[in-house]
Amino acid sequence: MSTETKNYITPAGWQALKDELYQLVNKERPEIVQIVNWAAGNGDRSENGDYLYGKRRMREIDRRIRFLTKRLEAAVVVDPELREATDQVFFGATVGLLRGDGREQTVKIVGIDEIDTAQNKISWISPLARCLIKAREGDEVVLNTPEGREEIEILSVEYIKID
């Protein structure tokens, strides 16, 4: 994601990123620093597994902390519950669909840091979300897939809390 692209995120997604950052900064990193300091005092570092693993884990944690910090700084929190009622699909919508194969599906359009296919949370920049954005309840949209074109009917559009 380029720096010009907004990082839209729901309040629940924002909180999840903040919670992960807090956990890394205040719990995991201090524990690893303690292990590395202890292991460093045990002599030869070149064959010291605790030291080598600890340093590697600390780099991973630091990398994740930098990533989360940047994502939170670029975040634009959008609360779907505060959106005026509309039958048009935008970020934060919970959308009922009738897929081309006759299956009904409900998807929630969320930020890229919140994707969870097990809970039908799809990114607002995913191909499915992109073809749904700005469409209205009752509209049919076309999703181009590697297998071909799929016609999808929008059955419902709601703006409710997304956990």
UniProtKB/Swiss-Prot annotation:
Listed Gene3D superfamilies: Transcription elongation factor, GreA/GreB, C-terminal domain (3.10.50.30), Transcription elongation factor, GreA/GreB, N-terminal domain (1.10.287.180)
Pfam family, one: GreA_GreB
SUPFAM superfamilies: FKBP-like, GreA transcript cleavage protein, N-terminal domain
Protein name: Transcription elongation factor GreB
Biological processes, Gene Ontology terms: DNA-templated transcription elongation; regulation of DNA-templated transcription elongation
MF (Gene Ontology): DNA binding; RNA polymerase binding
Function: Necessary for efficient RNA polymerase transcription elongation past template-encoded arresting sites. The arresting sites in DNA have the property of trapping a certain fraction of elongating RNA polymerases that pass through, resulting in locked ternary complexes. Cleavage of the nascent transcript by cleavage factors such as GreA or GreB allows the resumption of elongation from the new 3'terminus. GreB releases sequences of up to 9 nucleotides in length.
Keyword Membrane attached: no
Domain of life of the source: Bacteria
Residue runs in coiled coils: 54-76
UniProt organism field: Neisseria meningitidis serogroup A / serotype 4A (strain DSM 15465 / Z2491)
Family to which this protein belongs: Belongs to the GreA/GreB family. GreB subfamily.
Alphabetic keyword roster: Coiled coil, DNA-binding, Transcription, Transcription regulation
